[in-house]
Amino acid sequence: MSSRPELKVDDEHGFIRFYKSLPQLGEEAIRIFDRGDWYTAHGDDATFIARTVYKTTSVIRQLGRSDHTGLPSVTMTVTVFRQFLREALFKLGKRIEIWASPSGRMNWKVVKQASPGNLQDVEDELGGQFEGAPVILAVKISAKASEARTVGVCFADASVRELGVSEFLDNDLYSNFEALLIQLGVKECIVTQDKGEKEKDPELAKLRQIIDNCGVAIAERSAGEFGTKDIEQDLSRLLKDERAASLLPQTDLKLAMGSASALIKYLGILHDPSNFGQYQLYQHDLAQFMKLDAAALKALNLMPGARDGAKNMSLYGLLNHCKTPVGSRLLSQWLKQPLMNAEEIEKRQQLVEAFANDTELRQSMQEEHLRSIPDLYRLSKRFQRGKATLEDVVRAYQVVIRLPGFIGTLEGVMDEAYRDPLDEVYTNKLRELSDSLVKLQEMVETTVDLDALDNHEFIIKPEFDDSLRIIRKKLDRLRTDMDNEFAEAAEDLGQEREKKIFLENHKVHGWCMRLTRTEAGCIRNNSRYLECSTQKNGVYFTTKTLQALRREFDQLSQNYNRTQSSLVNEVVGVAASYCPVLERLAAVLAHLDVIVSFAHCSVHAPISYVRPKIHPRGTGRTVLTEARHPCMEVQDDVTFITNDVTLTREDSSFLIITGPNMGGKSTYIRQIGVIALMAQIGCFVPCSSAELTIFDSILARVGASDSQLKGVSTFMAEMLETANILKSATAESLIIIDELGRGTSTYDGFGLAWAISEHIVKEIGCFALFATHFHELTALADQYPNVKNLHVTAHISGTDTDTDVITDEDEKAKKKREVTLLYKVEPGICDQSFGIHVAELVRFPDKVVRMAKRKADELEDFTSKHEEENGGGLGVQYSKQDVEEGSALLKDVLVKWKDEVKSGRMSKEEMVARLKELVQKDERLLGNPFFKSVQAL
């Protein structure tokens, strides 16, 4: 960071005037000025970059004379600029405009634009390694009071030239829209602008909150851009099919078409003629994949978060042993789109099993074949946009010549059970694609000089053209002369060639010699040798003869390149026609890469994963034996305690888990969600045996950490998440609730937790897991047979009862209650609270712990005394039978009393006296424990 470029601008005042005349971009956008081999930013953007990249404002320089009229500016090297670009687009969700002045002074214009969902212009600067495909989505809603809320979306991953549309009904919390954002892994969302401060649309505000919760960048566009007037004409220019766009069924989705119109304008697709006739339009069906809400995404740790240190902290990091960038991106997509069709899941499982059982097949795929595959989607994109070079053609060729290796390895599978599935999904497709690409291979072999690749030279074969052949001969002769000069120098200096002294083609100095730094002394004070530069790897130097040869060589190389450039253009043009085939190949290899990665994880886990049995949708039960949390078991210093899980419709569809803090409740309920998701993406699962039903959604309510930053209290965030769950859950959902009702008073919190639990059990009837500290909630199991109580166990040694006999303070300390958490989940209720134990674990001051214990004991004494005074606490002093019997006896007395007093002749006092008399006469009623507790006369 120390070697920042110096701020040198030709016409300072002219640039300041120009910069200040530019319109404001708003907080979300940043302007960068490209000045050749360095970059600058100015004004507020300079301050932002100084704080974000350099972490100090001392790097800001003033352009112009004084602070008053000057312009705060900051400079960046190419490396720092690229680092900032990644940070701004991937983490901060900013839009970037890059300005350049191609034809000299003060002729600035925007040459590149980028945003989190549109990285096309800056792919080269970013280096092409992204976790997921940058998907950008536009959304338009219709929420009239008389109609149901309808949401229309259009989305695109610009790198694969596909437009997806979808239109669906939604509830007032937009749960379906949230599920869609997560399914697609959207990075940026285009919404309509509010008309003004006075006319704020509450529906739009809700939409923004959801987009924000999912960590998606927001771009605003005027309502006019969502108009559908020109959309049919635009689509007919973009789509591959020649048929009129108006005949497509998707054009009836008016809201989605409005979104498509805004998206096409935002991406500027129509400005690039290479896009015409290249796009495909498809309709996305929300119901074909399991739905996940934003809370589930966090609760299950699907994707790496900003705070995740180790790779294995997220499921994506754990499962990502992909060897290709396309494989990693497909894995990211699969994790957000778990399948709902048992047949499709089993197909994937069968393929995973093939690679898991055959170690040789798996290792040769990973180490020999997949490792050498470049990012074919990005490569294809370079061809389509006319940016490809001969090097890109060679990279495509190198993939083609490796295909027979893939096919041969797959054909070597002997087991009949796996042979057919592998043939269907991979071998046959690869054979067909390999045949289609044979012509590309032949063309490269006849036109490109493959021998020159060893020197990292990408040139056309000299035999292909007479003038090239003549220049090549001269170049070869010069190369020989250089080698001779090198040999002479090595002998003269007494250095061993290729060990101490080297001949290299340096990117700045051209052909020159290099000595290791330890041997560099031998050329000092020797007039024959001219030193070029000293770098980490040694000292570069040359001789007058070598310098002359190098100049001639460079001159001839330029001639060669000029002569071959038209031939190169032809070769690149022919290779570009193979883009659709390369994209199909990319899809097959990405699928293969993810499946092999699943197999690798399943075999290399601390305890191997097993293939789960999947029941058809709407049937069966979920039974997991010795289940483990996949991310937790691979952490260092963790010995994971396994637990069994049984979820059946009639007996245990709602599990209430009580127990001490840090006892493993959260891990237990989350691991069930993670295992269900792993099973539905076709992966093996961390159990000793497993059978699962298919869930249509996983909905979670877990800790809300950053809600205050968005102006929402923790309790409010909790209620919003829960409302979302209750509105979007169906009978086939899996609900995970980790604590509920903690952010309010104990009584309100318990009331809400009870009511919500009862609603899930009675009205929704889905599978649910509820970890709670409200021990009273366990009474639900007495009312509903499908509610089961579980608790996490703890071993308690020592007791407090006999401490008053012990006089020695040390002995007292030894005798105090020791709690050992066992992390085992057992049936039944946990009858104690362990909050103070956790305080002891984290070394709270002794004084605070003692005070807490005293207060807790006082409260317990007060409660028990209060209950005794009232004839025993509810649910403690009498049985269910007592309640039924007491109620019946009381009813008889009241009916008898009612018959006597209905004539209306008695006064109020006489009526009360008569009722007391009847009660006193009934000995059975007076002896009933339940009646004693409710007696109020």
From Swiss-Prot:
Alphabetized InterPro entries for the sequence: DNA_mismatch_repair_Msh2 (IPR011184), DNA_mismatch_repair_MutS-lik_N (IPR007695), DNA_mismatch_repair_MutS_C (IPR000432), DNA_mismatch_repair_MutS_clamp (IPR007861), DNA_mismatch_repair_MutS_core (IPR007696), DNA_mismatch_repair_MutS_N (IPR016151), DNA_mismatch_repair_MutS_sf (IPR036187), DNA_mmatch_repair_MutS_con_dom (IPR007860)
GO molecular function: ATP binding; ATP-dependent DNA damage sensor activity; mismatched DNA binding
Residues holding ATP: G659, P660, N661, M662, G663, G664, K665, S666
CDD domains: ABC_MSH2_euk
Transmembrane stretches, start-end: none
Keyword terms: ATP-binding, DNA damage, DNA repair, DNA-binding, Nucleotide-binding, Nucleus
A GO term from the CC aspect: MutSalpha complex
Pfam families found in the cross-reference section: MutS_I, MutS_II, MutS_III, MutS_IV, MutS_V
Subcellular location, principal: nucleus
GO biological process, one term: mismatch repair
Localisation per UniProt entry: Nucleus
Function of the protein: Involved in post-replicative DNA-mismatch repair. Binds to mismatch-containing DNA.
Subunit note: Heterodimer of msh2 and msh6.
Family the UniProt entry places it in: Belongs to the DNA mismatch repair MutS family.
Cross-referenced NCBIfam families: PRK05399.1
Protein name: DNA mismatch repair protein msh-2
Organism expressing this protein natively: Neurospora crassa (strain ATCC 24698 / 74-OR23-1A / CBS 708.71 / DSM 1257 / FGSC 987)
Name of the encoding gene: msh-2
